[in-house]
Amino acid sequence: MDKLNFFEEIRKDAEETYKLNPEDADNLMRWGEALLELSQFQNVIDSLKMIQDAISKLEDAILIDPMKHDAVWCLGNAYTSYARLTPDDTQARLNFGLAYLFFGIAVAQQPDNQVYHKSLEMADKAPQLHTGFHKNRLLSLLGGVETLAIPSPKVVKNKKSSDEKYIVMGWVILAIGVVACISFRKLR
């Protein structure tokens, strides 16, 4: 079974399971992940719509289980995917910022998960890479020969363990605030 059919089958199963149990956070996460994967096979407009739907499913999963770190991480991926497809720099930066926020929450929930740390690190660099990519693309579309250099990544200095405790506590407090905001938004 190819990748498209595989994720389409997961999406359909999740949709059916949702009808039976709309409070199943694991199922909502699977549904969001499947939509995110399926978005890669769409044109840009349909892909953005599918990513928005994935974001909605993942937010619902987090509302049900705020400590579901894998759903939080996947939500960061969804915002990253959305930002990459957004040519408007301001809108892209907003979505990259949300991705960074959710990756940070995932790191706070699972500090030993290296994938989460790497995602957070990449999300920090993503806005610069996005801007460089779209500027280079614009130059090539306009027939320009000049290419823009991608800025070199910042050197990350080691932090003291006491600082890390405050950072983790900050992310936990921020996570509570984000969950409260999402809950409030869903109620309206």
From Swiss-Prot:
Protein name: Mitochondrial import receptor subunit TOM20-1
Cytoplasmic side: 1-164
The organism's taxonomic lineage, starting at the top: Eukaryota, Viridiplantae, Streptophyta, Embryophyta, Tracheophyta
Alphabetized UniProt keyword annotations: Membrane, Mitochondrion, Mitochondrion outer membrane, Protein transport, Transmembrane, Transmembrane helix, Transport
Gene name in the database record: TOM20-1
Subunit structure: Forms part of the preprotein translocase complex of the outer mitochondrial membrane (TOM complex) which consists of at least 6 different proteins (TOM5, TOM6, TOM7, TOM20, TOM22/TOM9 and TOM40). Component of a mitochondrial large protein complex that contains, at least, MIC60, DGS1, TOM40, TOM20 proteins, and petC/RISP.
Membrane topology: Single-pass membrane protein
PANTHER family reported for this sequence: MITOCHONDRIAL IMPORT RECEPTOR SUBUNIT TOM20-1-RELATED
Misc. remarks from the entry: There are four genes (TOM20-1, TOM20-2, TOM20-3 and TOM20-4) which encode mitochondrial import receptor subunits TOM20, but TOM20-1 is the only one that has not been directly identified in isolated mitochondria from cv. Columbia. In mammals and fungi, the transmembrane domain is located at the N-terminus while it is located at the C-terminus in plants. The overall orientation of the protein in the membrane is therefore inverted.
Pfam families in the record: TOM20_plant (PF06552)
Family: Belongs to the Tom20 family.
Expressing tissues: Barely detected in roots.
Membrane topology, Mitochondrial intermembrane segments: 183-188
Main location: mitochondrion
Database matches in InterPro entries: TOM20_imprt_rcpt, TPR-like_helical_dom_sf
Species whose genome carries this gene: Arabidopsis thaliana
GO cellular component entries: mitochondrial outer membrane translocase complex
Domain of life, per lineage: Eukaryota
A GO BP annotation: protein insertion into mitochondrial outer membrane
Cellular compartment(s): Mitochondrion outer membrane
Function: Central component of the receptor complex responsible for the recognition and translocation of cytosolically synthesized mitochondrial preproteins. Together with TOM22 functions as the transit peptide receptor at the surface of the mitochondrion outer membrane and facilitates the movement of preproteins into the translocation pore.
Ranges that cross the membrane: 165-182
Disrupted-gene phenotype: No visible phenotype.
